[in-house]
Regions:
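Membrane-interfacial terminal anchoring regions of lipid-handling membrane enzymes
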Residues: 1-661
Length: 661
């Protein structure tokens, strides 16, 4: 449990100093020049990027030859040959086919075509594309000194096109980008992406030892040679909820390994935060979360999507964070000398301390991405509307948005709020941009529900309402990282048996563990997160801490009430999953059956009036709830008591319940 004698004054000084020093760069709108000059001239201009000082100049074919002749790949080829009984030459040919399918073929003519086409598209779609120039300058310096790995957040298909467009604009080396095999199947477009720097990989490799060897050697060869910055999405896939996803470690392990083996002096990891004022795929994501199959990537689908060009998607902010030195991070954490005990070309499973280091690094990078996400007024408005599904008077929404703005800024949120603009104008402007999600009628603001074309069943009406709620939730989710820790403390205070700090901490710790699949909570940071939450709530006057108690102040009631409401959908979602597992789940339930079964169970509860939360229908929440239950230690029973605005649920979860899965 948390120390009863923790020096909170020291913590206040430490966190206060950190937040005071959180000075972020300013932005430049790169579309401003595009609106005032020739796009063709821009695309055909002299492009002479600064390169890594240790670069080994080579063309794509030379790069492939280096990979195919590498000692590590030959070792695996011989291993696979012995296991399969096939001749090494045949396995070598398989490796060559895999590499041919995978490798990029960067061509400047294709890059120039994209530069021209994207200029036209971006000027139509977006009001501004804002980039922090100081971040670009830091990146330019980093690229010259050491191999660079770009790690953008991933919320839209637009992300990797946007990244390459920005680097081309600033005359920086274009990255080679890890892309899913889905894109390769797009006629013409797949090859164009390949010729603009994309290399294609399978979504999963299974136990394919040869594929993994070709893939990892290809990436490491590009890194060692300084061929180009490497770009991939640490989250692995687009976040349909606009919350950060638990990082995937495979590619990160690969790009860090050359440093551990002494093949490069250092590797710079650059977190990039891409913030969309309005998400292109907002309704598509909501439907996917409700079980509608994801549309297959195709050229015809891309052409049909041209209708989005008639829409206004507001602004994009792209923030290039401080380059993170792997060498500095690893100092005192990983003993690199152990790597000298084995031949470098023999693939080995990462050591435990290395796995721990890579995992910790991945979480820290995603936290840096979150910290530099730019929040627009709409994310605050969406947070308020979701806690008032019956709607709010426009004047009340305006007043509460201003209040929430102050709270967010006091918690060091990176908020893009128009200078000197009246709050009423900011709110009306946001409502106009997001008119597909919210509308004003009779002076009252409420969520928009799609109009049915004909008679609908109660289930269909519920689905339409859920699409609206989940679309709105994707914006609310963008501010969760700012309020998460104080919100968990607010729920813990509401749930704890007493106001004693240790009691509250125990509830906080349980919530922290439960929600570790839904939010980015760095392993081992439970106490630190609790202490930060205490500091922030004390700072805003929401709680006071006499002796060993944590007590709400008179001023704290609206703050704690808002925070409880913020996590209410997640509490209710997990509660519904627990109810389903305890009351409904049958023997031998598979994961494939689990999602539709829980959704059907939740639909019945909503239609019967026993549940008011539409977010419990989200497959993302249902998967995360199950993952949390399976991850946690159920050697003894947990009594889950969830107090909420609507209900108190108590469920005994035991191994016997989970054994049904």
């Amino acid at each position: 449990s948390v120390s009863s004698s923790f020096p909170f004054s020291l913590l206040r000084n430490k966190i206060g100093k950190q937040r005071k020093n959180t000075i972020r760069d300013g932005f430049e709108d790169i579309l401003e020049e595009r609106r005032n000059s020739s796009d063709l001239k821009y695309a055909l201009r002299c492009y002479a990027p600064v390169l890594y000082k240790g670069v080994t100049p080579c063309k794509a074919n030379m790069l492939k030859n280096i990979v195919l002749q590498s000692d590590q790949l030959h070792y695996v080829i011989n291993q696979v040959s012995q296991e399969s009984g096939e001749a090494p030459d045949i396995i070598q040919e398989e490796a060559s086919v895999i590499l041919e399918e995978m490798a990029h073929r960067l061509q400047i003519s294709t890059v120039r075509f994209f530069a021209f086409a994207l200029s036209k598209a971006f000027k139509t779609l977006f009001q501004h594309v804002c980039v922090n120039e100081e971040g670009i300058q830091r990146l330019q310096q980093a690229i010259q000194e050491h191999p660079v790995v770009l790690l953008p957040s991933h919320r839209s298909y637009m992300d990797f096109l946007l990244m390459s467009y920005i680097l081309y604009t600033y005359d920086l080396a274009l990255p080679v980008i890890a892309a899913g095999m889905d894109f390769m199947g797009m006629k013409f477009v797949g090859e164009m992406l390949r010729m603009s720097g994309a290399f294609f990989i399978r979504r999963s490799f299974g136990g394919d030892k040869l594929y993994w060897a070709v893939f990892s050697e290809y990436v490491k060869t590009m890194l060692r040679n300084g061929f180009a910055p490497i770009e991939f999405f640490l989250e692995g896939t687009r976040s349909r909820t606009c919350k950060s996803l638990t990082p995937k470690l495979g590619l990160l392990n690969i790009v860090i390994e050359p440093f551990f083996k002494g093949e490069v002096f250092d590797v710079n990891l650059v977190p990039v935060s891409i913030s969309y004022e309005r998400i292109l795929e907002e309704s598509l994501y909501a439907r996917e979360l409700l079980g509608v199959p994801k549309p297959k990537e195709s050229t015809s689908g891309l052409l049909k999507a041209r209708r989005i060009l008639s829409e206004d998607y507001g602004s994009i902010h792209v923030y290039f964070g401080q380059p993170v030195s792997v060498r500095s991070l690893a100092q005192g954490k990983v003993n690199r000398s152990k790597y000298n005990l084995f031949p470098r070309h023999i693939p080995r499973k990462p050591m435990e301390e290395t796995q721990s280091f890579v995992n910790d690094t991945a979480y820290r990078i995603v936290r840096l991405q979150e910290d530099n996400m730019v929040l627009k007024p709409w994310v605050l408005m969406a947070s308020l509307l979701l806690q008032n599904l019956e709607g709010l008077e426009l004047s009340v929404l305006t007043e509460q948005t201003l209040w929430l703005r102050g709270l967010a800024l006091s918690y060091a949120a990176f908020l893009d709020w128009p200078d000197h603009a009246p709050t009423a104008k900011v709110v009306s402007s946001s409502l106009a941009l997001h008119r597909g999600l919210a509308c004003v009628s009779g002076g009252r603001v409420s969520l928009v529900v799609g109009e049915p074309l004909g008679p609908v069943t109660p289930e269909e009406a519920l689905f339409n309402r859920a699409v609206s709620v989940l679309s709105c939730a994707s914006y609310r989710n963008q501010v969760l990282h700012v309020f998460l820790r104080p919100a968990m403390l607010a729920v813990a205070m509401h749930t704890a048996a007493s106001s004693r700090k240790n009691e509250v901490y125990n509830c906080f710790s349980f919530l922290w563990d439960v929600f570790s699949n839904d939010f980015i909570l760095c392993p081992g940071d439970t106490v630190q997160d609790f202490e930060e939450a205490c500091y922030l709530l004390v700072k805003t006057g929401a709680v006071q801490m006499p002796q060993q108690d944590i007590e709400m102040t008179d001023r704290g009631q609206p703050i704690l009430s808002f925070f409880n409401g913020l996590l209410e959908p997640f509490l209710q979602g997990y509660q519904v999953v627990c109810r389903y597992l305890c009351e409904e789940a049958s023997e031998g339930l598979t994961e494939k059956q689990y999602i539709p079964a829980v959704r059907s169970f939740a639909v019945k509860l909503i239609l019967a009036g026993n549940l008011r939360c539409y977010e419990v229908l989200s497959s993302d929440m249902q998967k995360n709830a199950l993952a949390a239950l399976l991850r946690m230690d159920f050697n003894y029973s947990y009594i889950w008591v969830v107090k909420s605005h609507f209900a108190v649920g108590m469920f005994v979860l035991t191994k016997a319940v989970l054994a049904r899965l």
